[in-house]
Amino acid sequence: MKVAIVIPSDINSAPYLQYYADVLKRKEIPYYFISWNRKGSNDSLLCENNIVYTLESAETIPLYRKYIDYMCFSAFVRKELENGNYDFVIVHTIQASLFLGKYLKKYFNNKYIIDIRDYSKLLIIYKSRFHKYLKCSALNCVSSPGFLSWLPGDTEFTVSHNLRSDSVYRDYKYVLFDKKIIRILTIGQLRDYSTNSRIIDAFGDKNSVLLHFAGNGNAKESLEELVLQRKYKNVVFTGRYRKEEENDIVERADFINILLPTGIHDVNIMSNRFYLAVIHRKPMIVNEESIQARYVEKYRLGVVVNEQDNICEKLMQYIDLFDADLFNEGCDLIKKEISSEILLFEKKVESCFS
């Protein structure tokens, strides 16, 4: 057997590909990535087992150009599948599934997996077509149960967390807050100005709080300008970081900020920050509209705020009433739940190759 793992982006930007690779390695099944080098980088060309389609395609290009670029990538994938004698396909994203769906349905019926980790506006037009492709797959996976709110209700989906199984079992110890300085970390892409500026204005004039923003993004420059305008002295931007630095950055924090926009995608995702907070046992700040708030409330993992709340007051109340035993118990319980769902995902993927 030979498996193709299709991703319409650079494989270095998609760590979740390894969840499938882990299973295939255990079963000693040969596999190849078929990826799209959209930024013209040479990094992906050096990766093992990676068949690369190179065409620069920025996120900001017009919609018709995106359509043409996806058509070209899909043609490249079809040609590789035909010439490479593949037996099974794992295709990531709704967009790639739609462009390849007709071909997969005809030549790989019940021999492909659709993996969904993002919402796509293409579903507004092509929802019924996508439904057909889901019905003809061997397995359908989602990175968040929140996606079920906009996916077909008569189709079975398996949760594939944005986490490898070995990461869940890392045992970090909870460290009590340093009451002199509370360190609130926002880590990862800084895409949204509104939610991040809300955090900055909530704590920007509080000497007892240090706000740390680690990562780049479209909103970073505007947020830095806001801090300068407000003359806040307790906000730090450290920019891009290496993956190997991530654990040390998180360990120095007391809270993880996960306030997100309230669009259909953002309220339904399980963010990487959420998993970092759980693994490192760091209380988190989430907005009540998000699916992450359900877990935070159920397992007592932090502070849930709405649009009217005074975030600073809620955080200080949480600290005053904080029970370390209850918090650690909640971390243990959610890690157990995540572990069981990862095990179920791996078993279902393995069953596709039995």
Which functions belong to the PLM regions below?
Residues V6, C141, V175-T195, I199-K206, ...:
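Conserved donor-binding/catalytic core segment of Leloir-type glycosyltransferases
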Residues K121, K135-K179:
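Donor nucleotide-sugar binding/catalytic pocket of nucleotide-sugar-dependent glycosyltransferases
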Residues M1-G40, G84, L139, D201-D205:
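N-terminal subdomain of nucleotide-sugar transferases
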Residues D10-N12, V23-M71:
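N-terminal strand-loop element at the rim of the active site
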Residues N306-E313, I319-S354:
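A charged, aromatic-enriched C-terminal amphipathic alpha-helix characteristic of glycosyltransferases
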Residues D22, S74-K79, L98-K102, K106-Y107, ...:
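Membrane-proximal helix-turn-helix segments that form the acceptor-binding/catalytic region
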Residues S194, E244-I249, I256-L276, I285-R294:
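Nucleotide-sugar-dependent
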Residues E221-D248:
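Nucleotide-activated donor-binding/catalytic signature segment of Leloir-type glycosyltransferases, i.e.
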